[in-house]
């Protein structure tokens, strides 16, 4: 009996040591980053796909069930998920992932956001008081977040600190090399005049040195009217653009209309993992984004 007891005790101790951190990611980019940094010490789940608008998700029972079992919540923050995440946290009853707990990680807490409104006026559309939250379009910002996320994993799973540190060092080296390659490949894109559908590309624009000529949405998050689009056509006669960009999850109707009226190229960029069939991980996401922009800028 004593041998059986000791055997069971050793078994459960072994299971505890090998236990994985259960990560609930709000968006695919954070699930992918968690996998890069956590390796076989984590299990991951993404609440959204690359073809969903993360602003508008329902806190459905299946998501609540997943969040109940999470050890770590990895989300964008800065009000991106404000329409559903607070309800999810509350319904989960999981103290580990409540705001302020070590198990709640918001990526935008670790970078400097732009686009902070001078005044809050909801009549001006879907604006974010904390600033533009779409930081995953910049590999520079993503690396900063990665370092912070690695430190959080080490805090939560101190028995495996050396493992997470090694994963971070490896990722940092590969990511810096890839970022340099992307910048070299995209050199010809500097100054490229573009039209965007929504202000979710600002960090990509800053990183690549693109020139934003116009935005299809007169008010953020509000689909452009025919009058809005006609005003864009008039504007483009004075300041021409070469490409109109929308995210893969967005309707292409407005971009298609503008292309038909003006003849400028249009492109759907993946925006995140799974935005198209080529963007299967973080590295391929930026590979494909650069490739698409170069192709449409010719």
Where are these regions (language model features)?
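Extended rod-forming repeat segments used as scaffolds/tethers
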Residues: 9-10, 88
């Amino acid at each position: 009996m004593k041998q059986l007891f000791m055997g069971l005790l050793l078994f459960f101790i072994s299971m505890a040591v090998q236990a994985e951190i259960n990560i609930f990611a709000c968006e695919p980019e954070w699930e992918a980053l968690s996998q890069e940094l956590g390796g076989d010490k984590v299990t991951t789940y993404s609440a959204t796909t690359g073809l969903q608008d993360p602003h508008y998700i329902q806190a459905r029972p299946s998501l609540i069930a997943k969040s109940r079992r999470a050890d770590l919540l990895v989300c964008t923050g800065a009000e991106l998920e404000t329409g559903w995440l607070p309800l999810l946290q509350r319904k989960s009853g999981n103290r580990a992932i409540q705001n302020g707990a070590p198990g709640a990680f918001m990526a935008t807490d670790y970078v400097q956001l732009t686009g902070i409104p001078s005044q809050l006026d909801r009549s001006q559309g879907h604006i974010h008081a904390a600033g533009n939250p779409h930081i995953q379009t910049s590999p520079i910002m993503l690396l900063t977040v990665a370092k912070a996320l690695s430190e959080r994993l080490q805090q939560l799973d101190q028995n495996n600190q050396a493992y997470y540190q090694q994963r971070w060092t490896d990722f940092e080296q590969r990511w810096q090399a890839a970022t340099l390659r992307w910048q070299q490949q995209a050199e010809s894109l500097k100054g490229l005049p573009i039209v965007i559908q929504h202000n979710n590309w600002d960090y990509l624009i800053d990183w690549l040195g693109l020139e934003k000529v116009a935005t299809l949405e007169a008010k953020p998050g509000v689909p452009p009217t025919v009058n809005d689009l006609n005003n864009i056509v008039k504007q483009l006669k004075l300041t021409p653009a070469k490409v109109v960009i929308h995210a893969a999850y967005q309707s292409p109707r407005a971009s298609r209309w503008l292309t038909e009226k003006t003849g400028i190229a249009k492109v759907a960029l993946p925006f995140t993992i799974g935005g198209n069939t080529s963007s299967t991980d973080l590295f391929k996401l930026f590979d494909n984004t650069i490739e698409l922009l170069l192709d449409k800028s010719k």
